Amino acid sequence: MSFNKLESYSNKEVIREEVAILTDLLADITRNLLSPETFEKISLMEDLAVNSKYHELKAIVEELTTDEMVYISRYFSILPLLINISEDVDLAYEINHQNNINQDYLGKLSTTIDLISTRENAQEILENLNVVPVLTAHPTQVQRKTILDLTNHIHSLLRQHRDVKAGLVNEKKWLGNLRRYIELMMQTDMIREKKLKVTNEITNVMEYYNSSFLQAITNFMVEYRRLAEERGIKLDNPKPITMGMWIGGDRDGNPFVTAETLKLSATLQSEVILNYYIDKVYTLYRTFSLSTNLSETSQAVAEMAALSTDKSVYRENEPYRRAFHYIQSKLIQTLLYLKEGNFSNDGQRLTDRAEEKLSAKANLSVSNKGREIIPNYIQSRISETLTELKKEETPSYKTAQEFKEDLQVIYDSLIEHHGEALVSGDLTELLQAVDVFGFFLASIDMRQDSSVHEACVAELLASANIVQDYSSLSEEEKCQVLLKQLLEDPRILSATHEPKSELLQKELEIFKTARQLKDAIGEEVIKQNIISHSTSVSDLLELAIMLKEVGLIDENGARVQIVPLFETIEDLDNSCNTMEKYLSLPIAQKWIASKDNYQEIMLGYSDSNKDGGYLSSCWTLYKAQQQLTAIGDKFGVKITFFHGRGGTVGRGGGPTYEAITSQPLRSINDRIRLTEQGEVIGNKYGNKDAAYYNLEMLVSAAINRMVTHKKSDSHTSDKYERIMDQVVNRSYQIYRDLVFGDERFYDYFFESSPIKAISSFNIGSRPAARKTITEIGGLRAIPWVFSWSQSRVMFPGWYGVGSSFKEFIDEDPENNLAFLQFMYKRWPFFKSLLSNVDMVLSKSNMNIAFEYAQLCEDQNVRDIFNIILDEWQLTKDVILEIEGHDELLAENTYLRDSLHYRMPYFNVLNYIQLELIKRQRNGQLTPDQEKLIHITINGIATGLRNSG
């Protein structure tokens, strides 16, 4: 049975109506800010863009003064943003509406659980499933936080539109509020004046927990359990969704991530979740006014109530209230310990409760860096409670399990005394939240490049007089040295008095901090350590040496899992050899056994794409998962995958449900993790309804892929794979010949794109490259993809696809085309692969791309565009032929309509950006005027709804 995507139920008429309201308001606001002549130019440019009259549009843009471009750029940047808001509001409405009328849609949780409810292993699947979105700070969120805040205000107002039409909200007042926020947006800086710091990235992402994640995940957990129990499936402690975090722990190529940022990230996360608990417990305190005159309580609740510092005579007969007050006091005390950094050198929480620490600052509820994201009323409540805590000893919680046990005492008492209806709602939701978030909120991954680990280990071995030139050893010799240290030598190598390099000192501090945080907050706070550019077993063992230095690993077990990240095509091809050798090591088997026999492997989508092109990347990743899963089976290890996907197709992006359900069979062993980064976080999780829906998609897709056999005919399956091997090998050659084989390509890319402006754009704390860029290989994947998106070529998402498939078809035109069409209908991986290319092509614009090519001074370099254009046309023709359609996005009318609304406006921005780049290169722009290029980058990314 097939279902429609929820987006297909969107109300296009409502969206058009709301877009008309928003655009009229924006036009009226802009008219008041500009001269009649300049506003007339905006109207004309808008008309020309809608009617695709690019030549005339270009002529007008070339005549604009730089001052005129300021507000014109803002106007055409805000227009697509307002359209995005309208679409997001409609989607949020449909999520609620379709669920309320019990309408099935693709990925709906109830339908998915129905699918497996009759299976013998249904309970095992639902109990063990763990899907982990990992939030990263990869710099692709071009919007300032201030603009995002204004966006949220407009979103909230637009959600009232249906009530306005029904007469439930005053229309004049509503329009006035909308106008105010749009006018504020129009006159607010759209770009950051300074580069983000890691601390900014941490606090920014925490806002999503307060606005969406906490409520959405809690609601999802309650629904997950309810649906299972309704179908007779009893679950003990399921965790279908938990959260991951890279910000503060990912130091690969980012020198600004330190031990301090790791500590800040972990402690701020704990503050956020503890404040959430404090707020929820206070709500329960206000609600549970049950009197002993009218109801009974258990002895355990009575004993807890007696410990409360709430001695009001009005609550003498309200034991539940006093019990919740006691719990709240313990939570606040826990928060105070955490806030003041009460960790000793070995990581254990201090027990000193000196009077001055309790009375120091009434607003100690949150850190200075994070105070703004905690509601004021919670800070006030904590301040009031401090006085009580000073008067009488109140313990803190050492673990989240202790907190849950206290809540369970109240829950059990209510159930025992016929309070089934009372426990549903807030109390049940709070218990679910504790299961998922503990006191840590999200597990932080640590990540570093393998070359850094090698340099640190080489220094440690030399300082301890073990090996003086470790890096010169062969791979076999390295492994022998490392294994001897791990198995036979108990020494702490860093304990020598030899002076340490700045790099080694910094790395050791980070690992020490990780140990302290795990001891203080719990094991869940840091579970994985990822090794970028993993190429060998020694890369994994070098990290083990570093972990051993701080007591996070020994010969019997590991407190942190070592996770290799295979990124390039070559490394992915060699990953099976690396992992087979690693899994054969007895010590590695013990480490894995201490992690319930799961071994995670991270797969890099971005670098593999830049290395070999879209087809080669996707197919290499697909085969690697098949082969690595088989190697895990050989050693009795459950291999799980962490997908390092970006927002764009060129970095592994695309529709999430299809991406997961098209993974190889058996590639999801209970667990799957995937990165959510940059603009994707805001688009998917900007409000609790959208967050719930996207989490539902993740879990439903994972379950579907675990239980549904997509390719039952092994002969056909083998033929699929033989065809893919042939096509992909050719695609790889075509891609490499141009990107790395044509000496003109480097100049073409840097001259025909806004890469220099993107590299200076203040959208993240991390540099655009790991080192000075002298070749394409030295450029990070994000600015690489971002630049092609801006120039509207979308090169990483399709180049090499058309020629490789055309050559295969031409070998036997009638039969080969027919079989590719058969594969498209029958093989989810292949359909997802081509659908993503279809989507990327629909966002490209080769008329605009041609104009960017003209930025190249040398005609010989400009000629590269003709190669790209020929491949683009061939790719489009071949894709439509295989799909059996006459136009792009024939199967995704929602996106087609959405692009139809937005595309004319950000097309204008491309022409403005082109003119600005020309003026910049001719020395006609001041430094302040050059910032206009950043505004156009912002607007184009907003219109495309992705960047890097």
Swiss-Prot record:
Its EC number is 4.1.1.31. It is an enzyme of class 4 (lyase). GO terms for cellular component: cytosol. The keyword Lyase applies. The keyword Lyase applies. Keywords: Carbon dioxide fixation, Lyase, Magnesium. It catalyses: oxaloacetate + phosphate = phosphoenolpyruvate + hydrogencarbonate. Pfam families: PEPcase. Its cofactor is Mg(2+). The active site is at H138, K610. GO terms for molecular function: magnesium ion binding; phosphoenolpyruvate carboxylase activity. Gene3D superfamilies: Phosphoenolpyruvate/pyruvate domain (1.20.1440.90). InterPro entries: PEP_COase, PEP_COase_bac/pln-type, PEP_COase_Lys_AS, PEPCASE_His_AS, Pyrv/PenolPyrv_kinase-like_dom. One of its GO terms (biological process) is carbon fixation. NCBIfam families: PRK00009.1. Belongs to the PEPCase type 1 family. Forms oxaloacetate, a four-carbon dicarboxylic acid source for the tricarboxylic acid cycle. This is Phosphoenolpyruvate carboxylase. The gene is ppc.
